[in-house]
Amino acid sequence: MATMHGLYYQATSTMDATHVNHVERPGTLPIAFSLFHYTNMEDASFMLITGETPVWNDGWQQRVQVSVNDHGKHRTVEEMMAQRIGDYDEFCTYQRTVFDRTEAWLAQIDPEELERVVIPRPFPDQVASTYSARVAGPGGITVLDAAECWMYQHGLRHMGEIELARSFVGLGGMTS
């Protein structure tokens, strides 16, 4: 997870608010969407897995000033086209806070905890159509499934979007 988070740190340290808020054309989400969406979803996923309160709250919204105070999972592309990050430095602080918490949790997790079922079968409609439902075993989505799908795989997917979108603003990718 730390290596994947490192890609996000590399990306954010080589961009500014102009880059992340750029809209290439209608239907193409700004980098701001992918950055905030993924970070906020990792924050929310942590809550679903551990029961701990998310980092994101009204205070963080006042600091970061995203234009759409929502991760956007259940919104349309048209709605999320409006996503912008108002204070990019504060966003980077929020991201670091979320990622540090996840990494600290993973560093101390009891391996037996990885088998605990987070969402049992049968899955609700919102879950049944997800990648994690495909990965889940007969009992449902375990902590390991959730961390792999909701955090790691999801993070890499959005990093791919970010690397492509960086080319739209004259920046390159970070890996080969």
Pin down the residues of each PLM region.
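Phosphate/pyrophosphate-binding loop motifs in nucleotide- or prenyl diphosphate-using proteins
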Residues: R75, E79-M80
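Proline-centered turn/helix-capping motifs that create local helix->coil transitions or kinks
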Residues: L106-R116
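A short, structured beta-strand-centered segment in the mid-to-C-terminal lobe
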Residues: M81-Q95
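Short, contiguous alpha-helical
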Residues: A2, Y9, V20-H74, D100-E103, ...
